[in-house]
């Protein structure tokens, strides 16, 4: 290798190294500015949403966002509650009583994350073989209590932490 080739290689190396160090430096300066725009982790962990349920008729449901995920709120009819409670636990892939999925004394209200437990798709309401929810992505069927009845989903739809603030308001989170 001639002396001139060594200079060219050394020059190329210094050029590349300088740009690399510069890019890392710019990234180190810009990252804190971008990161400070994210919500505070403590606030995000404690986030709550209050929902007015006074206008929801029996048999109807609404969807709200909480922590970036859909939450299904359904005001079930007496027939839907009876149907959910008549299911034998042996018939369920993930056995759970309907009574354990609702608040005592507020059996008509079902509150659950609107995310299929298989791969995270959003199920369609009032669809499927069990008059509950149907996941169009891979065919999971949930009943009127959000319990998996058929399909690849391994578990029932999740019930988030929630409470009734009063007769017209639910606080999720």
Predicted feature residues:
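Rieske [2Fe-2S] iron-sulfur-binding domain
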Residues: 82-173
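N-terminal secretory signal peptides and thylakoid transit peptides that target proteins
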Residues: 2-21
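C-terminal segment of N-terminal export signals and the immediately downstream linker at the start
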Residues: 16, 26-67
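Conserved C-terminal region and hinge/linker of Rieske [2Fe-2S] proteins, especially
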Residues: 12, 32, 39-43, 160-162, ...
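Short, positively charged
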Residues: 5, 40-44, 121
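Short beta-strand or tight-loop elements
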Residues: 47-49, 69, 97, 158
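Early exported N-terminus immediately downstream of N-terminal targeting peptides
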Residues: 63-78
């Amino acid at each position: 290798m001639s002396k001139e080739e060594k200079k060219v290689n050394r020059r190329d190396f210094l050029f590349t190294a300088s740009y690399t160090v510069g890019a890392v430096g710019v990234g180190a300066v810009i990252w804190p500015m971008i990161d400070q725009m994210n919500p505070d982790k403590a606030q995000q962990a404690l986030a709550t949403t209050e929902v007015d349920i006074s206008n929801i008729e029996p048999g109807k449901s609404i969807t709200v966002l909480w922590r970036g995920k859909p939450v299904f709120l359904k005001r079930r009819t007496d027939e839907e509650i009876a149907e959910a409670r008549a299911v034998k636990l042996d018939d369920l892939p993930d056995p759970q009583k309907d009574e354990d999925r609702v608040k005592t004394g507020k059996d008509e209200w079902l509150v659950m994350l609107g995310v299929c437990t298989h791969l995270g798709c959003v199920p369609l309401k009032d669809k499927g073989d069990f008059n509950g929810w149907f996941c169009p992505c891979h065919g999971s069927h949930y009943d009127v209590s959000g319990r998996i009845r058929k399909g690849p989903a391994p578990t029932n739809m999740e019930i988030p932490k929630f409470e009734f603030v009063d007769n017209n308001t639910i606080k999720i989170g």
